[in-house]
């Protein structure tokens, strides 16, 4: 079970939002590169970046901050990025800059064929982000709620080579209310693509529940406010997850 620190970028700063509300942003750092280095020093094995301005604008808006993060990371760990990725040219540029995996969100909902094109052009480098409120998929920086069900959409991507589905429960994001285990498990059981949980991670109980769900296809969780507010220590939490993964794997064997 991989705990993946999130670095959400707004106006060049590292922030955390509450339920995706851009007006409820807490600035945690004005130096994104230093924040990336901090999480690496805490044992991060992967980083999750989101260009929040880009998600609303439909194109990248924090490229200088992204580049400062990539410079700080070097080749130490993989970096994935979502927010405002709408065309193949942007994906190619990001991969050339050092991003390991792009996350297609709004474009995956509005134009699923774009995901197939991206997977064909850049195999092994594409994830899909499905963000939902009360089971309905949201787009455009969570500002619009569609009529799409998460599972129905996710199934469209099964045979195209998508690396993972990042499933975010918007109502829990930034609220420290616990991961929506039930919905995450339901999605993982319904599709063949690995699932990364997002939204609400708050304590070791969440980590234990996620580790139990690993055999169903839940491969990781995005860690946001919990590690920024020090409710969870990243190094200790990842160590605990590793121990649980080994424990439950032995039970399966």
Curated annotation (Swiss-Prot):
**Entry keyword annotation includes Cytoplasm:** yes
Entry's Gene Ontology molecular function annotations? 1-(5-phosphoribosyl)-5-[(5-phosphoribosylamino)methylideneamino]imidazole-4-carboxamide isomerase activity
Which SUPFAM superfamilies does the record match to this protein? Ribulose-phoshate binding barrel
Q: Specify whether Cytoplasm is a keyword of the entry.
A: yes
Biological process (GO), any one: L-histidine biosynthetic process
What InterPro entries does the database record attribute to this sequence? Answer: Aldolase_TIM (IPR013785), His_biosynth (IPR006062), HisA_bact_arch (IPR006063), Isoase_HisA-like (IPR044524), Isoase_HisA-like_bact (IPR023016), RibuloseP-bd_barrel (IPR011060)
Q: Where in the cell is it found?
A: Cytoplasm
The Gene Ontology CC terms held by the record are: cytoplasm
Protein name stated in the entry: 1-(5-phosphoribosyl)-5-[(5-phosphoribosylamino)methylideneamino] imidazole-4-carboxamide isomerase
What organism, scientifically named, is this protein from?
A: Polynucleobacter asymbioticus (strain DSM 18221 / CIP 109841 / QLW-P1DMWA-1)
Name of the gene: hisA
């Amino acid at each position: 079970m991989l705990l993946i620190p999130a670095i959400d970028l707004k106006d060049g700063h590292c922030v955390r939002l509450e339920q995706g509300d851009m007006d409820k942003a807490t600035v945690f750092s004005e130096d994104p590169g230093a924040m990336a280095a901090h999480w690496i020093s805490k044992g991060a094995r992967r980083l999750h970046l989101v260009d929040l301005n880009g998600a609303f604008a439909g194109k990248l808006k924090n490229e200088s901050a992204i580049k400062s993060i990539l410079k700080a990371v070097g080749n130490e760990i993989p970096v994935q990025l979502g927010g405002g990725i709408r065309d193949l040219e942007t994906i190619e540029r990001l991969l050339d800059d050092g991003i390991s995996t792009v996350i297609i969100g709004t474009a995956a909902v509005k134009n699923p064929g774009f995901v197939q094109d991206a997977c064909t052009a850049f195999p092994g480098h594409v994830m899909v982000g499905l963000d939902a409120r009360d089971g309905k998929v949201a787009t455009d920086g969570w500002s619009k709620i569609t009529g799409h069900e998460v599972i129905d959409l996710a199934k469209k991507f099964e045979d195209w080579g998508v690396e993972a589905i990042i499933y975010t429960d918007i109502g829990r994001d930034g609220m420290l209310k616990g991961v929506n285990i039930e919905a995450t498990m339901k999605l993982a059981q319904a599709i063949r693509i690995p699932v990364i949980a997002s939204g609400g991670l708050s304590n070791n109980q969440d980590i234990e529940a996620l580790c139990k769900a690993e055999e169903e296809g839940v491969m990781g969780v995005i860690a946001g406010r919990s590690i920024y507010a020090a409710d969870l220590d990243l190094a200790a939490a990842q160590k605990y997850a590793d121990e649980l993964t080994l424990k439950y794997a032995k039970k399966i064997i």
